[in-house]
Amino acid sequence: MKQFEDRFSELQADMISICMEYVEDRAGKVYVYASCEEDMISSSFFYLINNKYVECHKVNDALENGDEGYDVSTERQFMVLNIINDDAKKIKVLCKEYERDMPTEMKLIYDVKSGNFKAEYKYDLVHTNDDIKTSDDFADEWFEEIKKINL
């Protein structure tokens, strides 16, 4: 039992770690969205930097005077997304190996200052059952929700 929990936690920590690397450890909070439904895996990530909620491609918008800019190249963004997606695949394999249900949706929040980590999971199909919305739409909605409630 402990081994499953440890490996699951390590994979989530890796998702947060690569997102922190993307902003050179200069963020207040990190948010990771991962979706794994049927044979499709997708992800998204965003930040709270200088009290501004920003998507990964807009992190430079949160900089204050004198702050060094971030490398937000498409290549770096895809590198992070690929690692998050690979970790989600590993979680899927882990869940199968231990005969556990695989979350269809994972919302991870890491507060850098306090070290607090919060995870929210869904196990029912989310975007697969929606005729219009994709996993990206649900990730965008979560970003807007986080901004609205100041989480």
Range-by-range predicted roles:
Residues 1-61:
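N-terminal "first-domain core" detector
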Residues 1-9, 73, 77, 84, ...:
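Intrinsic-disorder-associated interaction segments
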Residues 5, 9-20, 81, 85, ...:
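Generic detector of well-ordered alpha-helical segments enriched in charged/polar residues
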Residues 53-58, 66-70, 128-133:
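Short, surface-exposed linear segments at secondary-structure transitions and domain or protein termini
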Residues 58-85:
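A broadly used, surface-exposed interaction patch
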Residues 75-127:
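Amphipathic protein-protein interaction modules
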Residues 109-151:
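Acidic, proline/glycine-rich low-complexity IDRs
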